[in-house]
From Swiss-Prot:
Its main location: virion. It comes from the Viruses. Major glycoprotein, comprises over 80% of the envelope proteins present in virus particle. The extent of infection into host organism is determined by HA. Influenza viruses bud from the apical surface of polarized epithelial cells (e.g. bronchial epithelial cells) into lumen of lungs and are therefore usually pneumotropic. The reason is that HA is cleaved by tryptase clara which is restricted to lungs. However, HAs of H5 and H7 pantropic avian viruses subtypes can be cleaved by furin and subtilisin-type enzymes, allowing the virus to grow in other organs than lungs. Glycans are attached at N40, N74, N160, N181, N319, N348. Homotrimer of disulfide-linked HA1-HA2. Keywords: Disulfide bond, Fusion of virus membrane with host endosomal membrane, Fusion of virus membrane with host membrane, Glycoprotein, Hemagglutinin, Host cell membrane, Host membrane, Host-virus interaction, Lipoprotein, Membrane, Palmitate, Signal, Transmembrane, Viral attachment to host cell, Viral envelope protein, Viral penetration into host cytoplasm, Virion, Virus entry into host cell. One of its GO terms (molecular function) is host cell surface receptor binding. This is Hemagglutinin. It comes from Influenza B virus (strain B/Victoria/19/1989). Binds to sialic acid-containing receptors on the cell surface, bringing about the attachment of the virus particle to the cell. Plays a major role in the determination of host range restriction and virulence. Class I viral fusion protein. Responsible for penetration of the virus into the cell cytoplasm by mediating the fusion of the membrane of the endocytosed virus particle with the endosomal membrane. Low pH in endosomes induce an irreversible conformational change in HA2, releasing the fusion hydrophobic peptide. Several trimers are required to form a competent fusion pore. One of its GO terms (cellular component) is membrane. It holds the Pfam family Hemagglutinin. Belongs to the influenza viruses hemagglutinin family.
Length: 362
């Protein structure tokens, strides 16, 4: 009988050490469970982090595009997209791109009515492609287009590489060449062929010029509003020019301009022809953009400093230290943590249980 009593005493005195999953030590950790609500445990691993705002960076493992043309000095992305003189150069390929100009504008050249068309979207459209290049050839012969012959207009506000008068390389300002064809005209149509490599999208830039009545008669022989239409890939767009009412505006140190240009673009899929119907003041397409592949685009800011696992619209460049994050929820690209509303913890200890009270000896 004594042997049995001794055995029971051993088992009782060691109970808190041999039962797995239970501890009697104090525990500061509380986790929420699906079945038992809040539970005290002996240890947890935090699964979430709350990022702090940082600068944007290059995405690890891929090329990241900031400016469309990094080597085009004193040029906005819209200058590059329209091929303003001194703003042409190689656009590096990239799998990820930073949208850093919310409302792109041109830095100089001829005054543009930016908000009459979707032209502000052009830089960001180009940014969404992995590979972008400007064609080496003009898409049409502007001098011999319907309604010609034309001379190609230039502006002193668009100095070229030799500091002579120039214009955007994507368009030709078609001005009637002589008095014989400097008259009002019915609508004319020109076909815009596909000249890119098969499989590429062709982005064709075009537009029109308008001025006050005196200048319209002087340049085109017609002071009435002119009509313009573009059509490509099932999308048709119509415009009517505005005559006069523009204050003189100087661009990039050039002479004050009483006229304005409206610029638009159309996307031609592989092998597809586009059309432009026009009257006087047409800016005929010339060099076109050939683009392929896809680049992930995210809103951000420049310069890009260093590298990061993830690019987040609100926090900039993030390195993934935890699988989840709390804070502001926004678009992110790369190897990013997942947004959660509240912090998550992984219990890696045991369930806490207060120590058993010893029975008093009788």
């Amino acid at each position: 009988m004594k042997a049995i009593i001794v055995l029971l005493m051993v088992v009782t005195s060691n109970a808190d050490r041999i039962c797995t999953g239970i501890t009697s030590s104090n525990s500061p950790h509380v986790v929420k469970t699906a079945t038992q609500g809040e539970v005290n445990v002996t240890g947890v691993i935090p699964l979430t982090t709350t990022p702090t705002k940082s600068h944007f960076a290059n995405l690890k493992g891929t090329k990241t595009r900031g400016k469309l043309c990094p080597k085009c000095l004193n040029c906005t992305d819209l200058d590059v997209a329209l091929a303003r003189p001194k703003c042409t150069g190689t656009i590096p390929s990239a799998k990820a791109s930073i949208l850093h100009e919310v409302k792109p504008v041109t830095f100089g050249c001829f005054p543009i009515m930016h908000d009459r068309t979707k032209i502000r979207q052009l830089p960001n459209l180009l940014r969404g492609y992995e590979h972008i290049r400007l064609s080496t050839h003009n898409v049409i012969n502007a001098e011999k287009a319907p309604g010609g012959p034309y001379k190609i207009g230039t502006s002193g506000s668009c100095p070229n590489v030799t500091n002579g008068n120039g214009f955007f390389a994507t368009m030709a300002w078609a001005v009637p060449k002589n008095d014989n064809n400097k008259t009002a005209t019915n609508s004319l149509t020109v076909e815009v062929p596909y000249i890119c490599t098969e499989g590429e999208d062709q982005i064709t830039v075009w537009g029109f010029h308008s001025d006050n009545e005196i200048q319209m008669v002087k340049l085109y022989g017609d002071s009435k509003p002119q009509k313009f239409t573009s059509s490509a890939n099932g999308v048709t767009t119509h415009y009517v020019s505005q005559i006069g009412g523009f204050p003189n505006q100087a661009e990039d140190g050039g002479l004050p301009q009483s006229g304005r240009i409206v610029v638009d673009y159309m996307v031609q899929k592989s092998g597809k022809t586009g059309t432009i119907t026009y009257q006087r003041g047409i800016l005929l397409p010339q060099k076109v953009w050939c683009a392929s592949g896809r680049s992930k685009v995210i809103k951000g800011s420049l310069p890009l400093i260093g590298e990061a696992d993830c690019l987040h619209e609100k926090y900039g460049g993030l390195n993934k230290s935890k699988p989840y994050y709390t804070g502001e929820h926004a678009k992110a690209i790369g190897n990013c943590p997942i947004w959660v509303k509240t912090p998550l913890k992984l219990a890696n200890g045991t369930k806490y249980r207060p120590p058993a009270k010893l029975l008093k000896e009788r």
